């Protein structure tokens, strides 16, 4: 069996086009365009690349994008003060603080300071709690983007055995909640899991997010499984690969996401969707 490739680039572009049309309709009706504030502290090269892609996506769909590039020496108090200012700004619908933050700044304190209805990354405990209670509002971007991919490919998830490899706050844990909502019987594995291979071999839907190149051998994949590879790893030769051995896995799976061009583009597309949702549902619903 040769797996069908789940093309995240194409789906992400569709999502962005849909958002752009809705923004045009808002502006044509005399309403304001959604506003996103992107905050970067320091000069981490990877963070700069991610932030640039988010700003570009904002411009593409017609959002008002505001950039705050702060020096590495910024104090926690200064960053919290900026967030308070943005929380009070009625033209800003979403606040994104790029992680990781420099040493000496408490990530949790910063993320919790963002108003929940402007938390377009979906990391605030309020939004994670809403997802856990089956009443989601703004949802964590990567897990929600993965669900969108499955939906757009008309993959019926109800009753599937889903296995999530990795239990991070950003992907693994919220992903497990999304999968429960999608009707899956869900297992989350982590560094203390015994006999990882056994879990992988029984997965109808496998989602891998550990950040280790080739961590899951293709021979572990169940015939006909759906494989979602969240990993983005750059090898010494410059090649970008996922957490799953792609060629071997693609020979056994029914669907698989490539790296790059699978999950990555969906994370930014979902951020854009969340910002539009924050604007239209919480801040400026039809200009009321």
UniProtKB/Swiss-Prot annotation:
Record function comment: Catalyzes the oxidation of 5,10-methylenetetrahydrofolate to 5,10-methenyltetrahydrofolate and then the hydrolysis of 5,10-methenyltetrahydrofolate to 10-formyltetrahydrofolate.
Pathway: One-carbon metabolism; tetrahydrofolate interconversion
Gene Ontology CC terms: cytosol
Known EC number: 1.5.1.5, 3.5.4.9
Gene3D superfamilies named in the record: Leucine Dehydrogenase, chain A, domain 1, NAD(P)-binding Rossmann-like Domain
Protein name (Swiss-Prot/TrEMBL): Bifunctional protein FolD
Amino-acid positions noted as binding NADP(+) in the UniProt annotation, renumbered to this chain: 166-168, 232
Family annotation (HAMAP family): THF_DHG_CYH (MF_01576)
Catalyzed reactions per annotation: (6R)-5,10-methylene-5,6,7,8-tetrahydrofolate + NADP(+) = (6R)-5,10-methenyltetrahydrofolate + NADPH; (6R)-5,10-methenyltetrahydrofolate + H2O = (6R)-10-formyltetrahydrofolate + H(+)
One GO BP annotation of this record: L-histidine biosynthetic process
Family affiliation: Belongs to the tetrahydrofolate dehydrogenase/cyclohydrolase family.
The encoding gene: folD
Keywords: Amino-acid biosynthesis, Histidine biosynthesis, Hydrolase, Methionine biosynthesis, Multifunctional enzyme, NADP, One-carbon metabolism, Oxidoreductase, Purine biosynthesis
PROSITE patterns: THF_DHG_CYH_1, THF_DHG_CYH_2
């Amino acid at each position: 069996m040769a797996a069908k490739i789940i093309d995240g680039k194409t789906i992400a572009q569709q999502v962005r086009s849909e958002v752009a049309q809705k923004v045009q309709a808002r502006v044509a009706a005399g309403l304001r365009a959604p506003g996103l504030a992107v905050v970067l502290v320091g000069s981490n090269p990877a963070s700069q690349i991610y932030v640039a892609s988010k700003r570009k996506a904002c411009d593409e769909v017609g959002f008002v994008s505001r950039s705050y590039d702060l020096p590495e020496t910024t104090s926690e108090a200064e960053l919290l003060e900026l967030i308070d200012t943005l929380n009070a700004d009625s033209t800003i619908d979403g606040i994104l603080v790029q992680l990781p933050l420099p040493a000496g700044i408490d990530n949790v304190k910063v993320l919790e300071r963002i108003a929940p209805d402007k938390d377009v990354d979906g990391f605030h405990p309020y939004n994670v709690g809403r997802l856990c209670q089956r009443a989601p509002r703004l949802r964590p971007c990567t897990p929600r983007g993965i669900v969108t991919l499955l939906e757009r490919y008309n993959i019926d998830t109800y009753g599937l055995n889903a296995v999530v490899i990795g239990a991070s706050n950003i992907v693994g844990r919220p992903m497990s909640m999304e999968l429960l909502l999608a009707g899956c019987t869900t297992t989350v594995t982590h560094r203390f899991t015994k006999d990882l291979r056994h879990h992988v071999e029984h997965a109808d839907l496998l989602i891998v997010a550990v950040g280790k190149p080739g961590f899951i051998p293709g021979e572990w994949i169940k015939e006909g499984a759906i494989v979602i590879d969240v990993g983005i790893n750059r090898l010494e030769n410059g090649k970008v690969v996922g957490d799953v051995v792609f060629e071997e896995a693609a020979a056994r799976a029914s669907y698989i996401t490539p790296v790059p061009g699978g999950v990555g583009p969906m994370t930014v597309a979902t951020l854009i969707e969340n910002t539009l949702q924050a604007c239209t549902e919480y801040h400026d619903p039809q200009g009321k």
